[in-house]
Amino acid sequence: MFGRLHRIMLVAGFGCSTLLPLSIQAATPAEQAVLVPVNALFDGMAKRDSEAMKKVMLPGGTMVLMRDGKPVQLTLEGFADRVGKPGTTSIEERIHDPLVRIDHDLAVVWAPFEFLTDGKVDHCGTDLFNLVWTDGKWLIASVADTGRKDCPVK
């Protein structure tokens, strides 16, 4: 299953990793390949590009956002449509020190994050991404986060 195409993806992921800030680079080429769709999601969010976000999502994927101790559930497609609406507020999500684990065609990314609006931290917490290897690429199957307002000042 992880033949020539997988090796190409790993090399491509490694090559793309040189464009990533050091704080979100993973240790191995395989881990870097897992982070490619995560970073593409963040890029699509910043550009408010719902189609770019959907390209790295498994159809039917889900999201759970913990807000004020309560889970808010939505589909990944619904999230992309919501974030992809035009707006004047700039948004950016940053992760750091990602913990990446891979078992064959499943992967998980656990990382602290900050979400910025107009360059200021709006909320922070931990992101959890579940990814699947399908059709020769990693896709985000689900996302959960612990968004909270009590973020450390940086």
Name these PLM-found stretches.
Residues 48, 58, 95, 104-106, ...:
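Extracytoplasmic
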Residues 8-21:
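Bacterial N-terminal signal peptides
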Residues 2, 20-55, 59, 154:
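Short, low-complexity N-terminal intrinsically disordered segments enriched in polar/charged residues
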